[in-house]
UniProtKB/Swiss-Prot annotation:
CDD domains recorded: UBA_atDRM2_like
Family from the record: Belongs to the class I-like SAM-binding methyltransferase superfamily. DRM-methyltransferase family.
Higher taxonomy: Eukaryota, Viridiplantae, Streptophyta, Embryophyta, Tracheophyta
SUPFAM superfamilies documented for this protein: S-adenosyl-L-methionine-dependent methyltransferases, UBA-like
The protein's name in its UniProt record: Probable inactive DNA (cytosine-5)-methyltransferase DRM1B
Residues in SAM-dependent MTase DRM-type domain copies: 243-437
Stretches assigned to the UBA domain: 20-60, 120-164
GO cellular component, as recorded: nucleus
Organism of derivation: Oryza sativa subsp. japonica (Rice)
Gene3D superfamilies: DNA helicase RuvA subunit, C-terminal domain, Vaccinia Virus protein VP39
Any one GO molecular function term: DNA (cytosine-5-)-methyltransferase activity
Length: 437
């Protein structure tokens, strides 16, 4: 049996609103000014399993008597409030007349039931918690999951957070957990400067070349500085620098080893890896110097670095060089020359169709707000222009070409697996190993 309370909330015989939460709790938050839809949405995310008795919600009950800090209780609702405001801004960016729906909403709203919804939210929360525990802001974590998909690995999410906002620009996080560290070229003591990530932009690393860094002895967990530009020990045909590094005696010569990971890993990761690999300093490289896609990676190896030579054929370094057919359709307001990091998830057909409809509606008189929104989507999903007002995702064979693999290298497995198999730039590895020939 259900009855209506004085606040107009339906209650069951146990005094629960809509059979899912104590009516007093719901009424309390409604009285604080939150909308009914937002309150029930928060309850739905926490869970509606009657056997669970809502342990999280029950923890909120002491607040009704003033025994608990309000900040902890309101955090979820305030987060929803911020997200709804962001959704409204995105809708305005697309079309002031509300004729074009928000892309993300269309992409991820599939009409699934409550059980699927709760499972999806639980997985999303776990990944957000993992990223936050690494030191990333929660809003960045949520945007990364939106870009890469819920099933993306944490490693891919980390890389996505640090992918440049526009290809060709170097982006650093604004976290105080990451430090600017300057090394003496004579192996002296390091000077570390903490930057307040909430108030200051991260300064670019301007220390001595990375091959003169002092080795890590494992006595600290400070992050390794990243060079700018991120070109590794040498670029092909780079005769301007004389590079030399000293390896421990027990790491000289064969057997050779080669370890690869994302360059912008959380604090302490590279230090720990280096400690277990003879304290060898990583070689940090951004693949944008070798191909048309940015991909920041670090490599710890004991390979010789002298006499490296480029591997032919040299891959194209811009989108127009890689895909000349896109030139005739590329709009002047899209300044991209390179792709962001390649992702294992791509935009859906519905997603690209909505972009086409939005552009077709305005014709040649495209408002700046719509240009900005479309460009953001193109950068997020690495879309290319294949027709008038028409964008498309990169196919696996096109990604193979960008990363230096032969055509059909990954053919025969699922599309998702195709892309996952392209995690390493083959031309870069070939460059690093040419000194062995």
């Amino acid at each position: 049996m259900r009855i209506a309370s004085s606040s107009g909330i339906l209650m069951d015989a146990n005094g629960k609103a809509n059979g899912s939460a104590p009516s007093a709790l719901v009424a309390y938050f409604l009285g604080m000014g939150f909308s009914r839809e937002m309150v029930f949405r928060a309850i739905k995310e926490i869970g509606n399993d009657n056997n669970n008795t809502f342990p999280h919600l029950l923890q909120l009950l002491p607040f009704l008597s003033g025994d608990t800090d309000s900040e902890q209780i309101l955090e979820l609702l305030l987060t929803y409030q911020i997200l709804e405001e962001e959704d409204e801004e995105e809708d305005v960016n697309w079309d002031e007349d509300d004729t074009v729906d928000n892309f993300d909403r269309a992409t991820y709203s599939d009409g699934s039931g409550d059980e699927d919804f709760l499972q999806e939210m639980s997985e999303k929360d776990e990944k957000i918690k993992s990223l936050v525990s690494m030191g990333f802001p929660e809003d960045e974590a949520m945007r990364a999951i939106t870009r890469c998909g819920l099933d993306a690995s944490v490693d891919l999410l980390v890389e996505s957070i640090y992918a440049p906002a526009s290809a060709g620009n170097v982006y650093f996080t604004n976290l105080s957990d990451y430090e600017d560290t300057e090394f003496s070229s004579f192996g002296g003591r390091k000077k570390t400067k903490l930057i307040d990530g909430t108030k200051k932009k991260r300064e670019r690393y301007r220390s001595r070349p990375q091959w003169n860094q002092v080795p890590f002895d494992g006595s600290h967990e400070e992050p390794m500085p990243l060079p700018n530009p991120m070109v590794g020990f040498s670029l092909p045909n780079d005769g301007l620098r004389s590079v030399h590094r000293n390896l421990p005696d027990h790491a000289l010569g064969p057997p050779f080893f080669y370890y690869e990971n994302v360059a912008l890993a959380p604090k302490g990761v590279w230090t720990t890896i280096s400690r277990f690999l003879y304290d060898i300093y990583p070689e940090f490289v951004d693949s944008k110097y070798f191909c048309a896609a940015a991909r920041k990676r670090g490599y710890i190896h004991n390979l010789p670095i002298e006499n490296r030579s480029p591997v032919l054929p040299i891959p194209p370094k811009t989108i127009s060089e890689a895909f000349p057919s896109t030139k005739m359709w590329w709009p002047s307001w899209d300044p991209r020359r390179q792709f962001n990091c390649l992702q294992t998830y791509v935009a859906s057909a519905k997603h690209t169709e909505r972009i086409r409809c939005a552009l077709g509606r305005f014709g040649d008189a495209l408002p700046p707000a719509v240009q900005k929104s479309v460009l953001e989507e193109c950068r997020k999903w690495n879309l290319v222009w294949v027709g008038k007002n028409k964008v498309a995702t990169l196919e696996p064979d096109e990604m193979e070409f960008l990363l230096g693999y032969p055509r059909n290298h990954t053919r025969g497995v699922s599309r998702k697996r195709d892309i996952e198999l392209l995690g390493i730039h083959s031309k870069l590895i070939q460059l690093h190993t040419t000194s062995l020939c």
